[in-house]
UniProtKB/Swiss-Prot annotation:
Family per similarity comment: Belongs to the PNP synthase family.
EC number: 2.6.99.2
Molecular function via GO: pyridoxine 5'-phosphate synthase activity
Listed transmembrane segments: none
Protein name, per record: Pyridoxine 5'-phosphate synthase
Amino acid sequence: MSSIYLGVNIDHIATLRNARGTKYPDPVHAAEIAERAGADGITIHLREDRRHILDRDVRILRETIQTRMNLEMAVTEEMVEIALKTKPEFVCLVPEKREELTTEGGLDVVGQLDKVKAATQKLTEAGIKVSLFIDADRQQIEAAKQCGAPFIELHTGHYADAETEEEQQAELKKIAAGASYADDLGIIVNAGHGLTYHNVAPIAALPEIYELNIGHSIIGRAVFDGLEKSVAEMKALMIAARK
């Protein structure tokens, strides 16, 4: 079975810091600990409203991350320019609404194909690997292929939010089918959103999944168990699911 990688999202370290307008806890320190514990990459979402990660964080993390930076961002001119200036290893294009608590669904690539394609091409030309955060829908996967994105990240939020075992299994089947279809098209498949220590194994077991991006559940557990232990435990669960 192939390896699976963990990208740790540290947005909520910044959320905690910004709640009091202090300089601590610092996402830069969190990234260092996560990497030490086995994280294969660090994911941050620079939102247009700067509600958690700040421009300062992006700049410093770009210099200090030892693994790879995955910058999540909306498809806007401002964000594309920031990415071109920062040059992270990866950019994940995501939908964004100011009123949402967190990203609510996948990017509608079909509905804004030209816009997403233009951003993807511009970032790719700068040597940045682009991923599109989409639902496990064939049309969206095909549109991602049209855009020239080498990666997609399948939205696992509906799977994570399922209230019954039957609903969860139905969502898992959709994700599995989407991952298989994208793999057939030559797209590398990541996944994430709402994944926890209790629901990660079935997603991690899907052979096409290259990387999982997980944040909230890891940071939540870190409050009680410490960040290093929490990252290591998540990575261990993912690896065990592949055996």
